[in-house]
Curated annotation (Swiss-Prot):
One of its GO terms (molecular function) is zinc ion transmembrane transporter activity. It comes from the Eukaryota. This is Probable proton-coupled zinc antiporter SLC30A4. The gene is SLC30A4. Probable proton-coupled zinc ion antiporter mediating zinc import from cytoplasm potentially into the endocytic compartment. Controls zinc deposition in milk. It catalyses: Zn(2+)(in) + 2 H(+)(out) = Zn(2+)(out) + 2 H(+)(in). It comes from Bos taurus (Bovine). NCBIfam families: CDF.
Length: 429
């Protein structure tokens, strides 16, 4: 076998020709790796030269193929010929397909990062709860509670990515996006119940001061917490991205670019948000470490433990308030904070042949999936252009303002006639 392979490579080398390879765009080649004829040479790279001047072509093509030179016939582009199924499949928009493939690849990378982060958070959160219980430290357990909020946020992000691939059903025609909102409400409620219990214990310790804390275990647990959060920061850090601490757009700026509201930015934003949460956990872990150091070497200052519980409980309440507010807005079908209804109406009015925008309703199926229903009236006499107007309005809502879905109703403008209701006439008489 080895001798046969060496003989094939030798024959291939002897067949090489230094003449430049000339091909036209109609030449056919077999790129199959399994060539039946051993006499044919194999190649992994191919250089194609396209020229208008036929004199540049060598008399014998270097690869043994007999290519026929043909002039470009642009008239074929003007002919309206029916396309076969195979041709239709080639006519698919490659940019759209490529963007979907890139989106799937991004989601896989994001899911991998967030899954690793969730596992680390879960393991260390359990370790902190056990260490805090053994050390009798409320500060350690409050830090674990804050870590629970970050773990919930990551799980909700993974849930949203998973639900985005699920198709709607006959009963749930919008899909299962609101399940993310329901999960957020349950997780925040659980966090508040645990926080209330820890605050109650902290108040009891502050009043009675009858407790002992194992400073060694508290110090070791706090030091491990700092190390874990540093690892989380490196894991979630995205080189080349600017890590902003604001997760919302200003209300007077309805958009920041094309398709700003779609999910191709959601992956980086999800990891970025988790990175910011990891920074917050790092600061809190450093605070617990300082308190543990004080209690370890100055046991009489054990009041630092309930004080840390108060401070960190406020931090947990502050970080979860935004989740509660966003959840309430979604449930009440309010307009997302980064969209401006008046600005969108003005943009729709600038479309040619649009007379007025009668109704515009905007809400969110879930976080990052705004939806719109709009009723547009056309200028009288422009009914024949309704497809063009609808296409422009749809492009504006989906691509410019980042709507996840939109429904557009069009009708010709009709001047309202002042008509008096028959009941009103009878009552007035």
């Amino acid at each position: 076998m080895a001798g046969s392979g060496a003989w094939k490579r030798l024959k291939s080398m002897l067949r090489k020709d230094d003449a430049p390879l000339f091909l036209n765009d109609t030449s056919a080649f077999d790129f199959s790796d399994e060539v039946g004829d051993e006499g044919l040479s194999r190649f992994n790279k191919l250089r194609v030269v396209v020229a208008d001047d036929g004199s540049e072509a060598p008399e014998r093509p270097a690869n043994g193929a007999h290519s026929a030179l043909q002039a470009d016939d642009d008239s074929l582009l003007d002919q309206d010929l029916p396309l076969t199924n195979s041709q239709l499949s080639l006519k698919a928009d490659p940019c759209d397909n490529c963007s979907k493939q890139r989106e799937l690849l991004k989601q896989r990378k994001v899911k991998t990062r967030l899954t690793i982060a969730a596992v680390l958070y879960l393991l260390f959160m359990i370790g902190e709860l056990v260490g805090g219980y053994i050390a009798n430290s409320l500060a350690i357990m409050t830090d674990a509670l804050h870590m629970l909020t970050d773990l919930s946020a990551i799980i909700l992000t993974l849930l949203a990515l998973w639900l985005s691939s699920k198709s709607p059903t006959k009963r749930f025609t919008f899909g299962f996006h609101r399940l993310e909102v329901l999960s957020a409400m349950i997780s925040v409620l659980l966090v508040y119940i645990l926080m209330g219990f820890l605050l109650y214990e902290a108040v009891q310790r502050t009043i009675h001061m009858k407790y002992e804390i194992n400073g060694d275990i508290m110090l070791i647990t706090a030091a491990i917490g700092v190390a874990v959060n540093v690892i989380m920061g490196f894991l979630l850090n995205q080189s080349g991205h600017h890590h902003a601490h604001s997760h919302s757009l200003p209300s007077n700026s309805p958009t920041t670019g094309p398709r700003c509201g779609h999910n191709q930015g959601q992956d980086s934003l999800a990891v970025r948000a988790a990175f910011v949460h990891a920074l917050g956990d790092l600061v809190q872990s450093v605070g617990v470490l300082i308190a543990a150091y004080i209690i370890r070497f100055k046991p009489e200052y054990r009041i630092a433990d309930p004080i840390c519980t108060y401070v960190f409980s406020l931090l947990v309440a502050f970080t979860t308030f935004r989740i509660i507010w966003d959840t309430v807005v979604i449930i009440l079908e309010g307009v997302p904070s980064h969209l401006n209804v008046d600005y969108i109406k003005e943009a729709l009015m600038k479309i040619e042949d649009v007379h007025s925008v009668e109704d515009l309703n905007i809400w969110s199926l879930t976080s990052g999936k705004p939806t719109a229903i709009v009723h547009i009236q056309l200028i009288p006499g422009s009914s024949s252009k309704w497809e063009e107007v609808q296409s422009k309005a749809k492009h504006l809502l989906l691509n410019t303002f980042g709507m996840y879905k939109c429904t557009i109703q069009l009708q010709s403008y009709r001047q309202e006639v002042n008509r008096t209701c028959a009941n009103c006439q009878s009552s007035s008489s």
